[in-house]
């Protein structure tokens, strides 16, 4: 900044004369000089221009000292011989004495000196701007070695001069974090041959992850199925047998499809379902408890649900894939038993009934149900006369006389066994009428039996059962006339 201030103060000292010509006037004078005229000597006479600047600098040393005292540091003198503009060099070449006036290019402002960090150190390196516009292509300037040449930028009259700056060498750090490469092997499921067992010994510490996932899935399915069964028991107790919930019923085909889908997620090439089930069963036997036992029975029967000695409750029915006949689902009625079964007709043979049991009963079979229709009829027949005797005893009447037993057919006479027809002789029915009336019980006759006084209590007149009377009449008709109705 000291050089900058020195140059600026020294140059401002030469700008002081207000009678200095403008740059256009100087250019016009240069053209007249080429024509043989020398108007510069008229404006700047030689007598008033000293050859050396020492006197002028000595005269103005007081201003420089005052500025130095105000700023706080001493300003060195400006050497005008070194900082010479192109116009000043031109004036010296044309035998013009040195002038304190500094020529400034058009458009130049002194304020630019305040904003530029670097002052012009060597005016010989600056290329004067050309008056012609830059419409042509740029000239390529070759630089060799450490020499720096000025280059003209496109659409810019000001020169651009690069500088070689020696930057300090950067230190190379050895502890830069670099990315380490890891080898990640591709996952290839291990498929054992069919002949080798799944689990070789109990001493092995690692088990195949794919089979472990299958076990957990099947166990969760069985547990969820048991929970669903308990929920279904309470849900379908008061409903009709034909109503069911398809979301809670899991049949065999759907279970197989789910197992195959689960294996497909873990193993891109799963083994056949039969082999997979065999492997899973071996795996479970070695580590965990097995699933519920399944028994399949086939028989020919006309009934849709053959009797097997246990009592079942139907909780669902639906049509499965591959069989047009519906499949019925049953559950054991015992509270502690969780055995289920589903019954369906064969797809090819309708007479064939296929029953599949899931689980084993943990209770004995209940006693078989017997048809007690004959015993019920006998007990009903025995209770009717007893009820009649109770009624008659309460009314103070004599019980009816029992009817004689019916004789066997061999004791019938030919006359009694002859058929009754319209061509036969007339039959006297007075005896039958009298005998039938004699069988009727004696009913007392009361006056005004249909009316009742205000303070009288109602009386109950129980009528005997008419079935005994009817039986007695029919027996007499059969014995006397052989009429069987």
From Swiss-Prot:
The keyword Mitochondrion does not apply. InterPro entries: WRKY_dom (IPR003657), WRKY_dom_sf (IPR036576), WRKY_plant (IPR044810). The keyword Metal-binding applies. GO terms for molecular function: DNA-binding transcription factor activity; metal ion binding; sequence-specific DNA binding. GO terms for biological process: endosperm development. Residues 399-411 have a biased composition (Pro residues). It is found in: Nucleus. GO terms for cellular component: nucleus. Zn(2+) binds at residues 332, 337, 361, 363. Residues 216-264 have a biased composition (Acidic residues). Expressed in male gametophytes (pollen) and in the endosperm of fertilized ovules. SUPFAM superfamilies: WRKY DNA-binding domain (SSF118290). Residues 43-62, 215-293, 358-417 are annotated as: Disordered. Transcription factor. Interacts specifically with the W box (5'-(T)TGAC[CT]-3'), a frequently occurring elicitor-responsive cis-acting element. Modulates seed size by negatively regulating the cellularization of syncytial endosperm. Belongs to the WRKY group I family. This is Probable WRKY transcription factor 10. It comes from Arabidopsis thaliana. The gene is WRKY10.
